[in-house]
Amino acid sequence: MAFIKRDNKNKKRFQQQNPLFKRKRFCRFTVAGVEQIDYKDLDTLKDFIGDNGKITPARLTGTKAHYQRQLDTAIKRARFLALMPYTDLHKN
């Protein structure tokens, strides 16, 4: 049985052209060196809320568990203080 040796270059090209290929996720907060997520930073918090108003899970965003808990608390505080809407039905 003969084996075909594949180049890494061809493998990368195939992965980029494949529509099912997904890049490795990383934690934005770890890279940035954030210690505490602030509930007043609405631009960052909006990135982690889906179109329907739900908090996006860590398995989709790549956020570490430590930061996901902080993110969850920060979003809930911002909602409680009326800085962010609870649902997608409210307009800013």
From Swiss-Prot:
Gene Ontology CC terms: cytosolic small ribosomal subunit
Transport listed as a keyword: no
Listed Pfam families: Ribosomal_S18
Cited PROSITE patterns: RIBOSOMAL_S18
Keyword field contains Repeat: no
A GO biological-process term: translation
Gene Ontology MF annotations: small ribosomal subunit rRNA binding; structural constituent of ribosome
InterPro entries, sorted: Ribosomal_bS18, Ribosomal_bS18_CS, Ribosomal_bS18_sf
Keywords: Ribonucleoprotein, Ribosomal protein, RNA-binding, rRNA-binding
Known partners and oligomeric status: Part of the 30S ribosomal subunit. Forms a tight heterodimer with protein bS6.
Biological role stated in the UniProt entry: Binds as a heterodimer with protein bS6 to the central domain of the 16S rRNA, where it helps stabilize the platform of the 30S subunit.
Family named by the database record: Belongs to the bacterial ribosomal protein bS18 family.
Protein name as catalogued: Small ribosomal subunit protein bS18A
Encoding gene, per UniProt annotation: rpsR1
